[in-house]
């Protein structure tokens, strides 16, 4: 699902505008699979699929495959709909340089929620 972020995000002008100040690479770990998400001026330029030997990223969000599957449901249950709720329960971790993450929090949350649109189509 993460690999579809470029097409999902880059077709959403409001989301691009919200993230226009973010120029970073962040890591998303879904179970054992790592993804590097490259963002430039709010556009997802590409998503690299790991494994990586020594990945360079600014911040990372990690969770089990089951946790991400629940998060990406078109209508997630309460608590499964928010990165911080899942971090609070220990089901996700957020690490690295949190300044760009927090400065662009709504953008990052909306980007990572975009795969929910795919759940509607299945």
Model-inferred region functions:
Residues 1-122:
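Feature captures hydrophobic
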């Amino acid at each position: 699902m993460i690999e579809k972020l470029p097409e999902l995000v880059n077709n959403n002008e409001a989301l691009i505008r919200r993230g226009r100040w973010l120029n970073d690479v962040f890591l998303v770990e879904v179970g054992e699979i790592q993804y590097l998400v490259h963002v430039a001026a709010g556009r997802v330029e590409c998503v690299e699929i790991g494994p990586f030997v020594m990945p360079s990223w600014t911040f990372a969000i990690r969770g089990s495959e089951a946790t991400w599957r629940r998060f990406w449901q078109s209508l997630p249950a309460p608590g499964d709909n928010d990165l911080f709720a899942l971090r609070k329960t220990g089901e996700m971790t957020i690490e690295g340089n949190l300044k760009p993450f927090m400065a662009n929090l709504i953008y990052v949350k909306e980007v990572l929620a975009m795969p929910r649109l795919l759940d509607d189509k299945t």
